[in-house]
UniProtKB/Swiss-Prot annotation:
HAMAP family: MltF. InterPro entries: Lysozyme-like_dom_sf (IPR023346), MltF (IPR023703), Solute-binding_3/MltF_N (IPR001638), Transglycosylase_SLT_dom_1 (IPR008258). It is a peripheral membrane protein. This is Membrane-bound lytic murein transglycosylase F. Its EC number is 4.2.2.n1. It is an enzyme of class 4 (lyase). One of its GO terms (cellular component) is cell outer membrane. Pfam families: SBP_bac_3, SLT. It is found in: Cell outer membrane. Its main location: membrane. GO terms for molecular function: peptidoglycan lytic transglycosylase activity. The gene is mltF.
Length: 480
């Protein structure tokens, strides 16, 4: 009897153990495979922006490459301010922050910081006509800066030297909005990083940069302080690869190099021309662009003639697109002074050059090569490419070619080329100017679209109020 009880007890225990084992096996979840890289960001010309041509920005392009490197789908999540960005990262809503944020002591304490993407200076910004401040101790008014920004940390450090220094913080505005307020005279001073300042003074030429408050501050991505070892390891490997391959140098050139040159008079004149001259020719630019962004075509025409259909040059070029007589014949144009024919001919000539360029030149840089060819001739650009290759540079990278083109006016170099002497430095300036005009046209387009959206939203609200009012009146007329 005892043996029987022992056997039954043993069987029961074994069954129980097996049941527990099975139950435990059932409740262990399968690891969820990650499919998306969620990136917190802020809107900004050099950070992340959406246009009619798609999404752009230094941080966006780097994030796109990083997601591709990780074999994940990229999801950019814009937030209203830095505080919301921090909360999103801390809560796990996003995997990292790519928002043009600077390396600061406070951020190092709270988060893990990635490697430097580029470096900026912090500059004091004021409006033309305001007395030029020598340093922050001579300011006539308070400084207004963004809440949680690196500028607040800089001011806190400066306050130790200048105890009377005071500032105001804006949580719901970004640097671009504060600089617009400077231009309108609503505030007197703000602080911006040098890149953001240089980009925005193209649209707000009244802006001026005062003393540099902090030099060569690294712009980095922010990662969570915990459970991000693998992501940090992947980011560092990715960064080293992109640095060696020239991607970082290319993006720096793309977003920042051409904006360093600034001409107040020219910028004001261009903004006036957008209002007064461009409307006459806008439809023609759009109609004949044929695959080219019409704003690049319009920017080229402005660089050539300032949108003057009767423009003439002692060298024989004429019209809105300043075509030579041989080029006009080549593209089938009879009257170079007819603005419509000129636009049609200039667009065809540019497209012909684009189609002629080697396939090795990346799509996002082909226009700059084509414009340089439009300016000094395709042969000279080919000479510069061969010269770049002989110097160990990349002949298909615009950042390298713009370093070589100016050498074409030096005997030491041009005597080795097929087509000889050329003013290559003028070609570089020519392309940079067109890129600035193009960026301004994109900005104006975006501003106009915002106004259209705001007007439509206001009309919808008014319509909803009217409908709501009618329904209220109808319900009031019903029997009780």
């Amino acid at each position: 009897m005892k043996k029987l009880l022992f056997v039954l007890l043993t069987i029961t225990l074994l069954a129980s153990c097996q049941k527990v084992s099975v139950e435990q096996t059932k409740v262990i979840p399968e690891p969820i495979k990650k499919t998306t890289l969620n990136v917190g960001t802020l809107y900004g010309a050099q950070i992340f922006v959406t246009t009619g041509q798609g999404e752009a920005g230094f941080d966006f392009e780097m994030a796109s490459r990083f997601a591709e490197y990780l074999k994940l789908e990229l999801k950019m999540k814009p937030y209203s301010n830095i505080s919301e960005l921090y909360q999103a990262l801390e809560s796990g809503e996003v995997d990292l922050l790519a928002a043009g944020l600077a390396d600061t002591p406070t951020r190092r304490e709270k988060f893990r910081l990635g490697p430097p993407l580029y470096r900026v200076n912090q500059v004091l910004v004021y409006k033309q006509g305001t007395p030029i401040p020598k340093d922050v101790s001579t300011l006539e008014d308070n400084i207004t800066v963004i809440t949680d920004s690196s500028f607040v940390e800089t001011l806190s450090q400066l306050q130790k030297l200048y105890p009377e220094l005071v500032w105001e913080q804006e949580k719901e505005k970004d640097s671009e909005e504060l600089m617009a307020m400077i231009a309108r005279g609503e505030i007197t001073y703000t602080i911006a990083d040098s890149s953001t300042f240089e980009i925005n003074r193209r649209y707000l030429p009244e802006l001026r940069a005062g003393p540099i408050l902090k030099e060569k501050q690294a712009i980095v991505w922010l990662l969570p302080p915990k459970n991000s070892d693998q992501l940090m390891s992947d980011l560092l490997t990715f960064w080293h690869y992109e640095k060696r391959s020239g991607t970082l140098a290319h993006l720096n050139e793309k977003y920042f190099a051409h904006v360093k040159r600034f001409d107040y008079v020219d910028t004001r004149a261009f903004l006036r021309a957008i209002d007064n001259k461009l409307p006459k020719y806008k439809e023609s630019f759009q109609h004949y662009a044929n695959g080219i962004d019409w704003r690049k075509l319009a920017a080229t025409a402005y660089q050539e003639s300032h949108w003057n259909p009767n423009a003439r040059s002692p060298t024989g070029v004429r019209g809105l697109m300043m075509l030579t007589l041989p080029t006009a014949k080549q593209v089938g144009i009879k009257n170079r002074l007819d603005p419509i024919q000129s636009i049609k001919g200039g667009a065809k000539y540019l497209n012909d050059i684009l189609n002629r360029l080697p396939d090795s030149i990346p799509e996002n840089q082909r226009m700059w090569f084509a414009l340089a060819s439009y300016n000094i001739g395709y042969g000279h650009v080919e000479d510069a490419r061969k010269l770049a290759q002989s110097m160990g540079l990349n002949p298909s990278a615009w950042r390298d070619l713009k370093e070589v083109l100016p050498l074409l006016h030096k005997r030491k170099y041009y005597q080795r080329t097929r087509y000889g002497y050329a003013r290559g430095n003028e070609a570089v300036h020519y392309v940079d100017s067109i890129r600035r005009y193009y960026d301004t046209l994109v900005w104006v387009d975006n501003q106009n679209q915002l106004l259209i959206d705001e007007k439509a939203s206001a009309e919808e609200s008014q319509l909803a109020e009217k409908i709501g009012g009618k329904q209220e009146n109808l319900s009031g007329a019903q029997p009780q």
